[in-house]
């Protein structure tokens, strides 16, 4: 009998439980000995710095590989499903914007620099985006210019779609290697959360968690509205009958499993089995379900939008609605890069924050806040993402059957 490898020991186990334990231990240490709690804050700072280091290369490699490996000439029957995926993700981001405007949230961060230069409306933001698009790719990676990174990744990905199979295999293997490094970093999340929570409570008091509770309320509120109101409306638009039997079936049989696995990729077999029982043809489900696990990211769009606007409010920035609408579009695009990576949506926050000229160190601290609330946030996000995959696929299948 072989012993488990070090990597399997490190990456295995229940991450949610370990993060929860780290959160509780950090809070207890801060209440018992605030001085020690401030000292262990270096663990959280190290974790956040690790996230900042991996985020640029992660976005570049995942987007490049995903576009380069996309099959040319996709089945036209998938187009209605893709439309629903894109529409659902954008509607989710827009819902997050509306709730964030209704319930603006500020966060307790370690630092609050006074030298911010917030953009003066949508015109300045568009100008910044255009100039960042043409940044030198190496400089974009070094400076974490995520807009430039995204532009180069998309451009190179399109150019490499007709590359040799060996090139595509290399890109896919490289993406998996980067994802493995990310998993190793994420495996230390319990220690990082322990340090972040301990330092936050010791420095700011337990009241800091009031802001986190409000933030979590906005996040979960947006997800509930999307899952029980907006997704059914989109399904009704497609099948023209009561959408709730199908919606509740998908939430119960796919969402619950995804909530505990916290992985859309791991939930693909569950969705495939459910799609088959719902009458979806295998040739459609075998493509649409894995594709949904990659690009259908309503929960991730909500997370990116809410946390980015919370970062803006924390820095005293008051976004106008036009800017927030642009954020919805950016969040929808960014969310597609969050698939298959633990905490992936959190790592894309710096990209969205760059729209408001929020420094990367502040964005990284917001990522840390995301990990503190991630015990619930990431589970709920995955449940929404994965259940929506099979929901929209089944809805399109039923609509096609009605036409036949």
From Swiss-Prot:
Q: Give the UniProt keywords, A-Z.
A: Amino-acid transport, Cell inner membrane, Cell membrane, Membrane, Symport, Transmembrane, Transmembrane helix, Transport
- Membrane-crossing residues? 12-32, 53-73, 81-101, 140-160, 177-197, 216-236, 287-307, 329-349, 356-376
Q: What are the subcellular locations of this protein?
A: Cell inner membrane
GO biological process: one example: threonine transport
InterPro entries according to UniProt: Na-dicarboxylate_symporter, Na:dicarbo_symporter_sf, Ser_Thr_transp_SstT
Please state which protein family the record places this protein in: Belongs to the dicarboxylate/amino acid:cation symporter (DAACS) (TC 2.A.23) family.
HAMAP family, per database record:
Ser_Thr_transp_SstT (MF_01582)
Q: What is this protein identified as?
A: Serine/threonine transporter SstT
Q: What species does this protein belong to?
A: Actinobacillus pleuropneumoniae serotype 5b (strain L20)
The organism's lineage?
Answer: Bacteria, Pseudomonadati, Pseudomonadota, Gammaproteobacteria, Pasteurellales
Gene coding for it? sstT
């Amino acid at each position: 009998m072989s012993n488990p490898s070090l990597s399997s020991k490190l990456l295995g186990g229940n991450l949610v439980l370990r993060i929860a334990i780290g959160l509780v231990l950090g809070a207890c240490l801060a209440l018992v000995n605030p001085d020690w709690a401030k000292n262990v804050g270096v663990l959280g700072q190290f974790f956040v710095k690790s996230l900042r280091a991996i985020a640029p290369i992660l976005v570049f490699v995942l987007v490049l590989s995903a576009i380069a490996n996309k099959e040319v000439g996709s089945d036209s029957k998938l187009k209605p499903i893709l439309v629903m995926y894109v529409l659902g993700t954008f509607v989710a981001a827009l819902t997050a914007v509306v709730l964030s405007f209704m319930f603006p949230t500020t966060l307790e961060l370690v630092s609050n620099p006074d030298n911010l230069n917030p953009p003066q409306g949508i015109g300045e933001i568009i100008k910044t985006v255009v100039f960042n698009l043409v940044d030198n790719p190496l400089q974009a990676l070094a400076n974490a210019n995520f807009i430039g990174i995204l532009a180069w990744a998309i451009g190179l990905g399109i150019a490499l779609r007709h590359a040799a199979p060996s090139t595509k295999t290399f890109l896919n293997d490289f993406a998996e290697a980067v994802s493995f490094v990310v998993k190793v970093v994420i495996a230390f999340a319990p220690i990082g959360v322990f340090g972040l929570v301990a330092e936050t409570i010791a420095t700011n008091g337990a009241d800091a968690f009031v802001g986190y509770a409000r933030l979590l309320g906005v996040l979960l509120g947006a997800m509930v509205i999307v899952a029980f109101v907006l997704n059914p409306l989109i399904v009704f638009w497609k099948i023209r009958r009561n959408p709730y039997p199908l919606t509740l079936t998908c939430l119960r049989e796919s969402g619950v499993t995804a909530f505990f696995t916290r992985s859309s990729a791991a939930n693909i077999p569950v969705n495939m089995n459910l799609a088959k029982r719902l009458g979806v043809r295998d040739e459609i489900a075998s493509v649409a379900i894995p594709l949904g696990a990659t690009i259908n990211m309503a929960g991730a769009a909500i997370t990116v939008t809410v946390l980015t606007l919370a970062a803006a409010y924390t820095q005293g920035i008051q976004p106008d609605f036009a800017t927030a609408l642009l954020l919805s579009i950016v969040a929808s695009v960014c969310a597609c890069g969050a698939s298959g990576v633990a905490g992936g949506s959190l790592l894309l926050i710096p990209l969205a924050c760059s729209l408001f000229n929020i420094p990367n160190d502040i964005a990284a601290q917001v990522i840390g806040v995301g990990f503190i609330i991630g015990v619930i946030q990431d589970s709920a996000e995955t449940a929404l993402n994965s259940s929506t995959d099979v929901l929209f696929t089944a809805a399109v299948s039923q609509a096609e059957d009605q036409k036949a």
